[in-house]
């Protein structure tokens, strides 16, 4: 891989690492699995050599596929490859993670995979509805429906929690 492509990837990672991580965690629901998926994608891209012109949707698609592959491999083995402490919502000992972050994670867990992914991409990763639809390979109307349905469920969940 050329040094300019290497620098391009490095710059992309620095700019989007948190968004990629948030997206991968929304799929895997496990921190280490999300990190592994992202690591795998960037290793593959570094080996590949040529990069597409529009990196953002391409790399998010690669991370999605790697995260889903991680889930499939775990399911095929029929065992849990994750330690209880790595699951979303579990705090590390001595962690100062605000309760609201844990609450948000718990609320997102109650949505379908499609709704959760769409909301994370739209709100946290600033994807347009068209970008979400392209990434997920679904019609635009499907992506917007997942988003609206997910937000409606979140409003209901928040209202129930605040009673």
Predicted regions and their residues:
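C-terminal flanking helix
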Residues: 17, 21, 42, 112, ...
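Arg/Lys-rich amphipathic alpha helix in sigma70-family domain 2
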Residues: 54, 61-82, 97
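Sigma70-family region 2
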Residues: 2-3, 39-55, 73-75
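DNA-recognition helix of helix-turn-helix
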Residues: 130, 136-163
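A short pre-motif secondary-structure segment
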Residues: 118-122
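A short, charge-rich alpha-helical start-of-domain segment used by transcription regulators
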Residues: 1-22, 32-35, 50, 116
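Structural recognition of an alpha-helix C-terminal capping motif at a helix-to-coil junction
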Residues: 22, 36-43, 53-65
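Acidic, proline/glycine-rich intrinsically disordered inter-domain spacer in sigma factors
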Residues: 11, 77, 84-109
């Amino acid at each position: 891989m050329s040094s300019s492509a290497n620098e391009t990837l490095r710059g992309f990672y620095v700019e989007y690492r948190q968004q990629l991580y948030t997206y991968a965690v929304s799929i895997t629901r496990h921190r280490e699995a999300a990190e592994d998926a992202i690591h795998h994608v960037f290793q593959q891209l570094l080996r590949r050599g040529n990069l597409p012109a529009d990196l953002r949707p391409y790399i998010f698609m690669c991370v999605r596929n790697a995260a889903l592959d991680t889930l499939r491999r775990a399911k095929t083995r029929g065992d849990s490859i994750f330690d209880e402490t790595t699951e979303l919502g579990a705090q590390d000992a001595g962690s100062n993670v605000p309760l609201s972050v844990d609450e948000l994670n718990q609320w997102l867990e109650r949505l379908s995979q499609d709704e959760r992914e769409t909301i994370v991409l739209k709100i946290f990763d600033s994807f347009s509805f068209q970008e979400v639809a392209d990434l997920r390979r679904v019609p635009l109307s499907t992506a917007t429906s997942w988003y609206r349905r997910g937000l409606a469920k979140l409003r209901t969940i928040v209202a129930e929690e605040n009673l």
